[in-house]
Each structure stands twice: as C-alpha cells, then as structure tokens.
C-alpha cells in the first residue's frame, strides 16, 4: 500500500505545501457551504470558483452541470513594472489553516519584496469572499495592484462595469461583471472592491480588455515598509436571487462598510462554532491532521439553512456535474448528523423539497410513492445522463433517503420535524418499495432488474444492498408511524419480513441472485452489517468481510469501501485489520501538495468528500463505537477497538445535546 507523506504532517490544524509544482498540483478548497474557492499554484489567483445550487444544461452528458463562476478575487501584483508569477518568485509556500478556513501563501519576489496572501470564503456571508494581501518592501519600490474579473468560458453577453458610488459619506469603487450561463438560462454576476487600511484610499483606476476587466491602484513603498490591503466581493446567480447583479453590488458595499477586521472576526467566530464539534485523537498526530482535514471539507461543503445537499466532490470543482447521489445520504450524512445535526438537516431539507419530483418519478416508472433519482440537481428530477444504466435502475438511493430521515429522528428526537417533513419522506419511500417488489413462487419478495450498489453488477435481481436498504426503509416507516401514533400500512412489515436474500452454500452472503464471484466495484454485501445492520452474527460478518475484501481490485474503485471494512473489523475486535483498511481508505488516494483525496487510488479528481464521510464513520462508529439505535432511537455505544497505537479518542459536542464521549484504548 502506498502511503504518501505531506509537509506539516504533525500540525493538527495546518497542512503546509512547501514545494509548489504547477505540473503536480491539486488545489485545496476554502468554502462556506455555498461558495467554493479552489487554490491555484499561481499566487493570489483561483483555479475554480463554484457556486452551490447553480446549474445549467450544457456540455457533459447533456444534463444539468455545475458552473464555473467568476474568479472575482484574482489579483495581480507588479513591482517596478514586473508582474509576480510562479516562474519569477522563490520560497512560495501555501498552507491550509483548517481551524480558521483560510488558504495562506508566502513568497519572495527577487530581492525586492516579501508577499503574504490569505483567501477566505466568508462563513457568515454565503456569497462573499475576501483576499488579504501584505507586502513588505525590501527595497524602495513601486507597487501596482490589479483585481481582475474574466468572463468564464462559455458565458455570453458579458457586461463589465466600473462605478464610483457615494454610499452615505463614503465613496465606494465597484467593479462588477454580468453574463448569461451557456444556455442563457441563468444570469451570473460578480462584484469586487478594494479595502484599504486606516481609511486611506489610493486613486483607483479601471481597465478593460476583450472578456475581462480590472481595477487597479499604484503607490510607492520605502524599504522596510509594510503595506496591507484586501479585495472583497460577492458572486451569485439568478438561481439564488431574482436580481443578482444589484445584489452582489449591495453585498460588496456591505463588506466594504463592515471592514476587514470585522469580516474576519465574524468568519472566525462561525468556524469556532463549527469546531466545537471535534474529534481529538491522542497518540497519532498524522491521523489527527487527516481526520481534521476530512471534517473540514464536510463542514466547508455544507451550510445550515441552505436547503442544499452535497455532491461527491462538494464545492471543490465540477466533478459528477455537482449532482447529489446516495453518497450524500449514506456516506456524508451520518457523521454530520452526529457532529452537527443542523448541517445534516439541510441535506434532508433538500430531499423534502424535492419530494413532489420523486413522486412524479415513481409515477413515470409505474410505481407508487416516491422514487428518488439516482442523480439529483436543482429540480429533483432524474439528471443521470441517458447513456448510464444507473439512472433508470439504481433504485437503492430511495431507501437511503428514507433511512436517513429516520436516522435524523433517532438522533434528534424532533417529533415535530418527523410529523411535518420526516414521515412524508419515510412513508412515501416505503410505499414505493411495496409497489416495486415482486412476490415470488418461494413466497419471498424480490426486487428485480436493478443496478447494484456494486455498479459493475447491472440488471441483476435481488441485489443484497438494494433489498437490505429497502427492508430497513420499510421497517423505519412502521416505527415512524408508531412514534407518531398514526396507522401504518400493514404491507410495510409484511414485505420487510419476507424480503429475499441469497447465500452461498458455505453461508457467505451472495451479492445478488446470479452472482458467481466476480470482482466488485465497491462494497455492497458488507453494508448489510453496517449501516443496514441486518446481519449481526459475528461469524457471518467476518465471513462476508473475508470473502468480499478479496473481490475488490487494487485500483479504480471508490474510497469508501475500505472505510466500511475498517469500521466492521473495529466492531469485530480486529484492530490490525481495522487499522490497515483505515489507511487504505484514503492514504493511497492523496494527491500533492496538500494530500487532497481522489475518488480512487491513483485518481486525479479530488476532493472526494464521499470517501471522507466514510472514513469519519470509521472513526466515530467504528473506533469510537457510536451507534444510532434504529429501534429504541437515540445514540448508544457498542463494543469496538481502535488502532493499537492510539491512546484515546474524544468526541466533543455530539448530537443535539452536545455530549462528550471519551473512548480509551483497552
């Protein structure tokens, strides 16, 4: 197994990249749950800006896609007429400070200046970002600064503007850009301005070129002089606001009047609140940093009250078109539910708001209830490319949504939410399964012709995970009805009790009715032990683990499978195997210079937050033994082991009661 090392490994909060190689660079993301800003090897610029909930139908797969937005924080520095670039600087380092959610960079330009820059996606302002820049002159010099806005590729009708506005008694100079998305469906807008220190205000000019514009200022600096300023701005689309161009201007003026110090204080306060829910590992500094990195990305890619869920790549880029899959409900939701239920609730709000679309999807396919799409975007209708079998046939996602809703109630005990939002989801997904099953001659219920969770198994009958999550969904519906004192459909428990599962002669669970031992893309059967918890017998769990771990190829398979192996081995008491698969779940997937996680070993598509969610489940529910009680509700702890060299794990502010759990190595 390849284990990658990255600089700054012993710091629990800061990942340092001290060798910036533009040819082997996979950027880090600072994000606030709405606005994702992805770093670049080029100083003070971004490689990508991503807006959550912003889709247009173009390009890949002829379905809705995430859009690259305006990189409104991009800044160029010239010193004595020479622009600072990657090829004329030295000692360029970058750091991700996860505790404060900031991307920091340092560089030296010739013998003339040292520069420090910091990029923030402001947590308190979902559509706003800021970059602070500090220059220390090592000689007398002339500094020229340009904040640039370029029209993103494919955007049309570009309208650049420069305005000098009187806001109260303050003059604010705004640079704004407005375009249409590639099909013209959305209006896209961005605005930015400079924030100067101590009320000073150099003369700000403006320039335009084809498809771009900039605002600029110049000033002389004496040797030893330190000068700091900031670029602040906002971006949004008509998916977020009916008048985005004026709203980004208003938000930019708001930031201008707040000032740098207050903006940073509010940002840090929000991240202090998020990090009150923490995982603290005693005895392994590298694992501590890695776990913080995974938590950081989950926190960064979602925000309370947004009504949005998370794509497999979060806000780190355009991977998977920004669509929402089972990844959200099965892999990311459970750790967030324990750490920050209010963030997890946003993911369920997303599903609840799209329940009418799920009903129509079931109707289109001849079923009852609600059938959630395999790939979901803004509308909640199916957004899988027509060339993929998963859209019409990977039905397990419906059960994942229904079970997630019950898990939320189990942890929070929020009966009002269950009545108003949770039960409609749980009931209608259960109704779907009743209409989806077929009663066989064996008096068992079968779910035929599906794509398995192991997606290499297409158009198979009785996939283990599909049947298992459907069975659990049906059981949860009956429990939810009892919790609310409403009448349950008798068919829910009848179908659940007679759901078909296949086994080999030696007792190993068979992945589907015709499975003959082929390699698997990702775990399927093993999910029956967790999170479905259908298989509870120690020997059966171990037999299934031993069989299917040997069916997983070394490469080209998603990262979360090994996380489930690790979790189950921890619960079975096998600490060495648990540690091996814990590392195997993400270490070979890390990419330079920050160790961002790709989907597969040797992959090049970070950040795979699905994998992070899986590993966090390993730590919380495997090594820590935390468990959601589906029957009695609430959280409990089950017996488990942690890696031998770990001394303890502390979980802080868990669940709505914000409990603390400390688990010591035995």
Predicted features along the sequence, with ranges:
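Active-site core of glycosidic bond-cleaving carbohydrate-active enzymes
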Residues: 324-354, 403, 410, 420, ...
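C-terminal capping/lid segments that line or modulate ligand- or cofactor-binding pockets
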Residues: 22-54, 331, 379-383, 439, ...
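Alpha-helical scaffold segments in carbohydrate-active enzymes
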Residues: 293-300, 350-357, 424-436, 472, ...
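Bacterial Sec-dependent N-terminal signal peptides
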Residues: 1-10
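Acidic/polar, glycine-enriched structural segments that form the non-catalytic walls/loops
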Residues: 9-30, 34-320
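A conserved hydrophobic secondary-structure block that centers on an alpha-helix together
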Residues: 111, 123-128, 407, 412-416, ...
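Helix-terminus loop motifs that line ligand-binding clefts
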Residues: 302-316, 342-403, 409, 416-420, ...
């Amino acid at each position: 197994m390849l284990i990658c090392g990255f600089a700054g490994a012993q710091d629990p909060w800061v990942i340092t990249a001290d060798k910036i190689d533009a040819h082997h660079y996979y950027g880090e993301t600072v994000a606030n749950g709405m606005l994702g800003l992805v770093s670049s090897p080029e100083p003070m610029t971004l490689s990508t800006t991503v807006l959550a909930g912003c889709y247009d139908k173009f390009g890949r797969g002829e379905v809705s896609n995430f859009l690259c937005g305006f990189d409104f924080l991009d800044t160029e520095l010239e010193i004595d007429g020479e622009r600072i670039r990657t090829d004329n600087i030295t000692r360029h380092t970058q750091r991700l400070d996860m505790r404060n959610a900031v991307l920091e960079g340092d560089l030296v330009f010739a013998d003339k200046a040292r520069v420090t820059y910091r990029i923030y996606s402001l947590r308190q302002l979902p559509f706003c970002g800021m970059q602070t820049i500090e220059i220390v002159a090592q000689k007398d010099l002339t500094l020229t600064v340009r904040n640039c806005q370029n029209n993103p590729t494919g955007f049309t009708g570009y309208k650049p503007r420069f305005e000098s506005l009187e806001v109260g008694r303050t003059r604010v100079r705004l640079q704004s850009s407005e375009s249409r998305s590639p099909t013209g469906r959305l209006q896209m807008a961005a605005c930015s301005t400079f924030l100067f220190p101590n009320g000073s205000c150099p003369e700000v000019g403006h320039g335009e070129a084809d498809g771009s514009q900039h605002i600029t200022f110049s000033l002389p600096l004496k040797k030893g002089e330190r000068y700091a300023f900031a670029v602040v701005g906002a971006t949004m689309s008509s998916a977020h606001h009916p008048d985005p161009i004026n709203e980004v201007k208003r938000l930019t003026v708001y930031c201008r009047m707040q000032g740098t110090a207050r903006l940073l204080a509010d940002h840090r306060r929000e991240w202090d609140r998020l990090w009150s829910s923490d995982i603290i590992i005693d005895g392994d500094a590298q694992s501590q940093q890695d776990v913080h990195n995974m938590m950081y990305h989950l926190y960064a890619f979602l925000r309370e009250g947004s009504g949005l869920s998370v794509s497999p790549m979060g806000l780190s880029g355009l991977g998977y078109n920004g669509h929402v899959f089972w990844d959200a409900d099965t892999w990311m939701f459970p750790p967030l539910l324990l750490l920050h239920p209010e963030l997890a609730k946003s993911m369920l709000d997303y599903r609840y708001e799209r329940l009418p679309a799920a009903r129509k999807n079931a109707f289109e396919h001849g079923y009852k209830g609600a059938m959630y799409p395999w790939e979901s975007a803004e509308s909640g209708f199916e957004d899988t490319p027509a060339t993929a079998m998963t859209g019409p046939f990977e039905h397990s996602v419906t059960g994942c949504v229904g079970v997630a809703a019950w898990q939320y109630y189990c942890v929070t005990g929020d009966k009002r939410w269950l009545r108003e939002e949770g039960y409609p989801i749980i009931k209608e997904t259960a109704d779907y399964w009743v209409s989806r099953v077929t009663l066989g001659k064996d008096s068992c219920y079968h779910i035929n012709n599906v794509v398995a969770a192991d997606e290499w198994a297409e158009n198979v009958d009785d996939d283990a995970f599909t049947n298992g999550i459907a069975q659990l969904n049906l059981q949860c519906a009956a429990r939810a009805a009892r919790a609310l004192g409403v009448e349950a459909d008798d068919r829910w428990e009848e179908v659940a009790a007679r759901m078909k599962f296949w086994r080999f002669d030696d007792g190993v669970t068979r992945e589907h009715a015709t499975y003959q031992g082929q390699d698997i893309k990702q775990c399927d059967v093993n999910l029956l032990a967790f999170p479905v918890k259908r298989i509870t017998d120690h020997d059966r769990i171990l037999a299934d683990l031993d069989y299917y771990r040997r069916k997983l190829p070394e490469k080209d398979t998603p990262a979360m499978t090994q996380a489930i192996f690790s979790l189950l081995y921890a619960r079975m008491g096998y600490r060495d195997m648990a540690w091996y698969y814990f590392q195997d779940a993400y270490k070979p997937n890390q990419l330079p210079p920050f160790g961002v996680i790709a989907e597969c070993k040797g992959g090049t598509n970070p950040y795979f937050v699905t994998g992070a969610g899986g590993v966090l489940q390993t730590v919380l529910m495997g090594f820590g033994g935390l468990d959601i009680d589906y029957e009695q509700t609430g959280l409990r702890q089950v017996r488990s082991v942690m890696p031998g060299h770990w001394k303890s794990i502390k979980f802080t502010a868990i669940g709505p009661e914000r409990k603390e759990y400390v688990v010591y190595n035995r």
